[in-house]
């Protein structure tokens, strides 16, 4: 019983420590990475290039899961898309 509690505690701790982020990928101008006219699987490949676990086209932009913390994702609060 103690072993089971210890095992579950370790799993919870791993889930807290290995925290990944998710969000919309950005292009070089700070805009969401468009997938409007891209082929199927485009966003999954782009997310994989950024070391994400998966991604899909959340029309019309690429949304990724499991991204490392160093990857910049689009944020409404810090949006610089189309602004000079």
Swiss-Prot record:
Site description Important for activity, residues in chain: 32, 59, 74
Domain (LCN-type CS-alpha/beta): residue spans on this chain: 21-82
GO MF term set: sodium channel inhibitor activity; toxin activity
PROSITE patterns with a match to the protein in the record: LCN_CSAB (PS51863)
Tissue occurrence: Expressed by the venom gland.
GO cellular component: a single term: extracellular region
Other remarks in the entry: Is the main neurotoxin of the venom of T.serrulatus. Negative results: does not show activity on Nav1.1/SCN1A, Nav1.7/SCN9A, Nav1.8/SCN10A and the bacterial NaChBac.
Name assigned to this protein: Beta-mammal/insect toxin Ts1
């Amino acid at each position: 019983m103690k072993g089971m509690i210890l095992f579950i505690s370790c799993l919870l701790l791993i889930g807290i420590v290995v925290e990944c982020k998710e969000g919309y990928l950005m292009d070089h101008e700070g805009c969401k990475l468009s997938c409007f006219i891209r082929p199927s699987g485009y966003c999954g490949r782009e997310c994989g290039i950024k070391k994400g676990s998966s991604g899909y086209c959340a029309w019309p932009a690429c949304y990724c899961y499991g991204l490392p913390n160093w990857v910049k994702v689009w944020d409404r609060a810090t949006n610089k898309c189309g602004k000079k």
